[in-house]
Amino acid sequence: MQLYTANGNWRKTFRSVLLGLAVGLTLALLNVLALKISQGGSKSWQNPVSALVDALQPAVVDEVIYRFALWSLLWVVLNKTTPEKAVWLSGLLAMLVHTYQHFDDLFIQSPLIAIGMGAVMAIFWGIPPLILARRRGLESAIAFHWIQDVARFVTGF
């Protein structure tokens, strides 16, 4: 996984961020629609400028912890036994950990529903940033995550 910002490659960083935003925008709208259906409406709309800033923290922190650190640690372990599959397998495992950590309470109440909801969430909002991070750099996954959170925060979720 690349981190173009660390190398000072601003052109690739910019292109990576734009791609993450482009891929993420449609799925961000789908995310808000799914939340409206599943939660019955928004809580309270947030100031758009605040949403832009507030969305940076979860986007950067989640992607650095799960996409960069956990993926890297799992790769170190898996590369010894399955070197040809280690990159994607470790990325998939890190993505599943990140996805299912959103359903900790639901696992206690309704484990099968948590598994199903996590699977849907992984398909729509886990696999795209996994592919973006692997193919276009960590910045692309951060941008994808950021636009998801901006849309959610602005609309009150």
Residue ranges and their predicted role:
Residues 1-60, 75-81:
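Juxtamembrane helix-loop-helix connectors linking adjacent transmembrane helices
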Residues 48-157:
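Transmembrane helix-loop-helix hairpins at the membrane interface
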